[in-house]
């Protein structure tokens, strides 16, 4: 999937690409944006720095599990607030200020001096707490949708900078497709691929908290201070060739041991998948 597109609705509303500027005051009454979840084909994690963040190198690939955010203009009495409603209620998804989509709308308003608020409608399709960055996709979609609705006209590089302030995984959905993430994962560089890939995801009833997995990773590595590895040439070659089997042989994730330590029963799932 390529970078996100905003689809406004209204009598004179044009289609708006997230990488191009739009008029200061859009005429659309609502804007819909779809954003993909992701899978990490490779993840190398280093020791945390003084700020507590882990340096890493990863390869993201967008998947066709799609989050949809619709940004709607508010009535006069609600003017200036940011609200979020789920299309399908889910107790695991907050709708208050802790939701990344709400934070994204507020951050964009603050950065651009917009005084009006927005009503966000969210349709979720990415599993919660599955490591597939559904919340980050929501935030990216909210940035693009509000940028179009409010006519703030920020280009993609400026949206990406705001996205990085929200979380390391938020910039990637703005470009989608397949990309290398470096730094904290927020520095995104697209890479060439060929063909399409069909992923099978085994979903557990209870997800794993990303912070909890990183904490266990730190406990397991101890004073070893692992160095961040580069993306293997075998993996990028497989992507360039569209070779699914070679790509499968190159998949690697430094957090797998920590996840298995927290949830040992996942080892059986992995064994079944590898034998299939």
Over which residues does each language-model region extend?
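Generic non-transmembrane alpha-helical segments
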Residues: 104-111, 158, 162-165, 258, ...
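Conserved, helical-rich catalytic subdomain that frames metal- and/or nucleotide-binding sites
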Residues: 175, 180-276
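Oxyanion/phosphate-interacting regions
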Residues: 1-4, 18, 269-276
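Contiguous, small/hydrophobic- and glycine-enriched helical/loop subdomains that border
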Residues: 117, 139, 143-180, 184-187
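ATP-binding N-lobe of GHMP and related small-molecule kinases
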Residues: 2-130, 148, 152, 157, ...
């Amino acid at each position: 999937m390529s970078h996100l597109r905003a689809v406004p609705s209204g009598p004179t509303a044009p289609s708006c690409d997230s990488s191009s500027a739009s008029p200061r005051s859009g005429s659309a009454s609502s804007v819909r944006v779809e954003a993909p979840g992701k899978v990490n084909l490779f993840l190398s994690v280093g020791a945390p720095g003084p700020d507590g963040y882990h340096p890493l190198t990863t390869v993201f690939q967008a998947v066709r599990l799609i989050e949809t955010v619709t940004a709607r203009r508010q009535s006069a009495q609600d003017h200036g607030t940011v609200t979020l409603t789920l299309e399908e209620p889910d107790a695991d998804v907050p709708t208050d200020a802790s939701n990344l989509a709400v934070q994204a709308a507020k951050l964009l308003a603050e950065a651009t001096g917009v005084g009006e608020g927005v009503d966000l409608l969210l349709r979720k399709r990415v599993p919660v707490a599955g490591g597939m960055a559904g919340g980050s996709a929501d935030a990216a979609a909210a940035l693009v949708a509000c940028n179009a609705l409010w006519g703030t006209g920020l280009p993609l590089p400026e949206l990406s900078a705001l996205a990085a302030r929200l979380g390391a995984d938020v910039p990637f959905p703005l470009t989608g497709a397949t990309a290398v993430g470096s730094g904290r994962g927020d520095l995104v560089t697209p890479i060439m691929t060929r063909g399409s890939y069909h992923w099978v995801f085994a979903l557990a009833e209870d997800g794993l908290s990303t912070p909890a997995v990183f904490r266990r990773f730190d406990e397991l590595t101890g004073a070893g201070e692992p160095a961040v590895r580069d993306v293997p040439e075998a993996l990028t070659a497989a992507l360039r060739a569209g070779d699914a089997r070679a790509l499968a042989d190159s998949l690697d994730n430094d957090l797998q041991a920590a996840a298995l330590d927290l949830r040992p029963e996942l080892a059986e799932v992995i064994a079944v998948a590898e034998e299939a």
